[in-house]
């Protein structure tokens, strides 16, 4: 079996480029020169949780060397206590970034000095990485006393601007936020929402078509779809996304990531 944790550690990424690994759902590791980020890492499979379609692709205790770990909202497949606790031990220098509304959920799990509460549209700079938190609408914008409880993160790493939307549907202002930051790589959910899943208390996301149209409208250089494969009752066929792009926007780059795939994105000019 492939050792993803070891592969992440030994992969050398020259600037201006980043390496991405997809670990299922919206779980990603992004590595640039001198810094490694984790997004919504969900690497547990405990009784009582919703059954996974496949086992975790890595053990959190093996993921050493992470510098910043993002959790976009409170749902367990995005903020997983059984992942965060061993991850904090394996990567003792990691800083954990999450919406301020999530801070009480990790009070007994993570050292307070290593946790940063984010507010949407209030930029951060951590370990040299520029971070712009943005609202996420899951499945509506919810702003409370501590700000938006669900957020996405735009990061600038090794000359690349990447947006991990978190769980979200479309809302006024999302396109403009992405365009303002000139996003290179957009990671977005495509599992959609519908009446029947809503009746089962499954909170929805962008559909494949909406994710495609968002990428085009925001003029992003590459779309990576996610959040479509892990739970049988909330899955989607990614082929719908590629069919839509092929018919209506054949000029929009989009990359299908296999489970555990390492993908290198480079912004080098042609011939450079």
Where are these regions (language model features)?
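Metallo-beta-lactamase
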Residues: 2-15, 98-160, 244-269
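Divalent metal-coordination and catalytic microenvironments
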Residues: 30, 40, 73, 80, ...
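Active-site environment of divalent metal-dependent phosphoester hydrolases
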Residues: 45-46, 75-79, 103-106, 122-125, ...
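Active-site HxH/HxHxD metal-binding segment of metal-dependent hydrolases
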Residues: 57-124
